[in-house]
Structure formats: structure tokens, C-alpha cells
Amino acid sequence: MEHAATLPQTSRRPATPLTGTITVPGDKSISHRALMFAGLAVGETRISGLLEGEDVLRTAAAMRALGATVERTGPGAWRASGPGIGGLQSPDDVLDMGNSGTAARLLCGILASHDIFAVMTGDASLRRRPMRRVIDPLGATGAVFAAREGGRLPLSVRGAAEAMPLSYRLPVASAQVKSALLLAGLNARGITEIEEPEPTRDHSENMLRHFGAEVEVAAHGTGKLIRLRGQPELRGADVVVPGDPSSAAFPIVAALIVPGSRVTIGGVGLNPLRTGLFLTLREMGAAIEIVNAREAGGEPVGDLIVTASDLRAVDVPAERAPSMIDEYPILAVACAMARGSSRLRGLAELRVKESDRLAATLAMITANGVKAQVDGDDLIIEGGGARGGATVATHMDHRLAMSALVMGLATETPVTIDDARFIDTSFPGFLPLMRGIGAAIEAAA
């Protein structure tokens, strides 16, 4: 879906501290996977807390087009069932994945090992993103992909009639590539083995077990070795989706940098492979308290109490990147407001996000008066506050848009973004939620 009119927004220092108790939308990674696994399983799955952003709705539509039953039964409540492993059908029309790189890459894995033909496209942003690192290893299943230069969408896939299991070492740690290969392995006879150089988010492995697949995970050097037995009988299993820690990052940093603020965020997912930002912010002196720790749907969950804090600079090691890969733009905002010089290491992966997120993050903070530079794959930020006053080009990147609006809550003069429409891809309701705790965000004049 291509969007029409833009939606510029401006944020400024609020007159009073941010306060209140909120919840953030369901975890995007888990929501995508819940719909996909439910659409492959025999029997009904009931999903609660599903993120109903544009990206996840694309996954729901794609699974319907492939023959699964997927329907909404209430706010965040969905019901899905599938034909079983190997039972998907060729879609009647092109699969449009909108802005969702996660949906597109994971779906390539499903399509590769099913004897079906499909064509996939996306919006202008997604069509610029490289898919080669997913479709190249998937070719070893016997699937045939045809794509534009660089493996970019639109692409077609003729899935393998008899898919071969994969044995593959990821050259770069990537939960999306790993998950695509595991999804392909579901309909391959034999054992699929994937070696990752660093641990990445393990929602796919957790959900595979939840739906009845046989998956083994073992430490392997600095990373992990995952082994999946193909062609299991997946059975429907209810899923509770926790609040997305990547979405919680925005009100968390806002509460930290607006003096006097205190905000509680309920039901946030605390998977240890997703909480690198929380660890980093605590190293910076952030007052983030976890209370009511519990488990929901096989994932650790807790409530976060965040209090405004005097932040100090931090040196973030490259090996932490997989656990916070989506949070670097908002971390850059926190570093800009901190005392001292911060260095965020090993950010090459940001260059192939919705935008060149490394270059765009640098442009966002420097345009607003922050001294910063890219050194190789590292981002160096001189803290001490930001002047503000700039209009930030969001490049159709939802996380960049939200980060810039949070930054404007603590700058000397307001910050404007050129377009807030794409925020709904991951965080529907972001603007009213932030206004509800006292954030001064309004339509740009």
C-alpha cells in the first residue's frame, strides 16, 4: 500500500513532567510469528494481545491468501487455523507485504519449502531493502527465486516440491534470516541445522516448541546451534503476546529525559535476547525498576517503573547489537541528552533497515545541534543536550519518526518530523498514548 498525504508533527518541551500508567502494543516479532505458526498448524489457535499495526495485518492477509483461516474476534484477539505442514496453496494474487521486512523475509521461508508459486511485493521502502541474504540460502531447499537486482522486491518463488533440509552458518547474526530458514525447515524431510555467530532473539524457537515441533538449541562458540526436525505435526496452541519492548523504548526514554517524570509501563516482554536497551540505559544511570515479573505465553513479562534520571555516557559493545538492533535511534537520543561522549559499536546492520538507519540517525541528531559522527560501523555521540529546531526527514521509517518526536520533548526548541504516518506500522496509537502521559506533540503548523 502506498500512502498519500504526509502527516508532519512537532514536539516540544512539556510544561509538566510525564506521568501515568500505560501499556504498549503487542510485540511485533511475536505477533508475526504467532500468525504464521498458527496458520501452519492443525487445529485452532487463539491469540490475545496481537499487535494490530499495518505490518502484522499484512502477515494476516498473506496467511489467508495461502489457505489459512485467520480472523479477528475482538481488539487484539484473533483466531487462526491452518491446513498442516505442507498443506498451503498458491495465492490467487500478488502478496503485498507493505513496509514489513520481517513479514517478507519470514514468508520467503514458508514459501520456499511448499510446492506452490507466489509473487511478493511491498511499498517503496521495502522494495529498496535487500533480500539476497535470505533467498540465497533458501535456494538450497530446491526453491527457485527470481528478484530484481540485489535480491530486491518484487520477487517470485517456485517452492520446492520435495524440500531439502538446510545446514547453514549465518555470516551475520540475524533473527529474521534464522527464522526464515527454520520456517523452511518445517516442511523439509530431515534435520535443519542453523549456526548463528551471536545469540539473536529466540521467539521462533520458543514458538516452535509451543506448537509441538522438535527443536534443540545448544551453545556453540560465541553463538548457538539450532537443530529442527522437519515435517512435525504442529498443533494449534493459544498465544499471549506481551507488550513490545522495542515500542516501550520510546516512552521509557521520554520519561528519562523529561525532568520530574515517572511513568509505569505494564506487561512488557522481557526476553533476555531483547532487553539490551534496558541494560544499556541502566548502565547510563537510568532508574528503571522491574516489578510483577511473570511469564506469559512462554515469554518473561514484567511491569516497568521509569523515573527521570541524570544520564551519563556509555560505550556499547558490538556483541550487544542483536539484542537491541531496533533501539539504536532512540538510544542515540538518550546519549545526546547524557553527560559525556558515547560510542555505539558495530552498527552495520542498521544500514539495511527501513532506511539507512545509521545515516538517518546521525542526520536526525546532528540537524538538532548534537555533535556526532560515524566511525566505520560505530556511532559516536557527544552528549550534553540538543538545540532542536530542525525538521527531520523520516525516510518512511517508523522508529526514526518516534525517536525524533521523543527528542523534541527535551530540546531547547521544538523538533518537527516530516511524516508520522508510518508510525502505525509498529505502534498504532503512539501519538495519543504519548499525549496521554503529558507529551507536547501536535500537528505541525
UniProtKB/Swiss-Prot annotation:
Protein's UniProt keywords contain Cytoplasm: yes
Binding positions for 3-phosphoshikimate per the UniProt entry: K28, S29, R33, S174, Q176, D326, K353
GO terms for biological process, alphabetical: amino acid biosynthetic process; aromatic amino acid family biosynthetic process; chorismate biosynthetic process
Keywords, alphabetical: Amino-acid biosynthesis, Aromatic amino acid biosynthesis, Cytoplasm, Transferase
Location (main, coarse): cytoplasm
Top EC class for this record: transferase
Active site positions: D326
Pathway(s) this gene product operates in, as recorded in its UniProt entry: Metabolic intermediate biosynthesis; chorismate biosynthesis; chorismate from D-erythrose 4-phosphate and phosphoenolpyruvate: step 6/7
Biased composition regions of type Polar residues, renumbered to the chain: 7-22
Enzyme Commission identifier(s): 2.5.1.19
Alphabetized InterPro entries for the sequence: Enolpyruvate_Tfrase_dom (IPR001986), Enolpyruvate_Tfrase_sf (IPR036968), EPSP_synthase (IPR006264), EPSP_synthase_CS (IPR023193), RNA3'P_cycl/enolpyr_Trfase_a/b (IPR013792)
Single GO MF descriptor: 3-phosphoshikimate 1-carboxyvinyltransferase activity
Catalytic reaction equation(s): 3-phosphoshikimate + phosphoenolpyruvate = 5-O-(1-carboxyvinyl)-3-phosphoshikimate + phosphate
Family annotation (PROSITE patterns): EPSP_SYNTHASE_1, EPSP_SYNTHASE_2
Binding-site residues for phosphoenolpyruvate, renumbered to this chain: K28, G101, R129, Q176, R357, R399
Subcellular location: Cytoplasm
One CC-aspect GO term: cytoplasm
A Pfam family recorded for this sequence: EPSP_synthase
Segments of this protein annotated with the region Disordered: 1-24
Alphabetical list of HAMAP family matching this protein: EPSP_synth
Subunit field text: Monomer.
Function: Catalyzes the transfer of the enolpyruvyl moiety of phosphoenolpyruvate (PEP) to the 5-hydroxyl of shikimate-3-phosphate (S3P) to produce enolpyruvyl shikimate-3-phosphate and inorganic phosphate.
Family: Belongs to the EPSP synthase family.
Protein name: 3-phosphoshikimate 1-carboxyvinyltransferase
Origin species: Acidiphilium cryptum (strain JF-5)
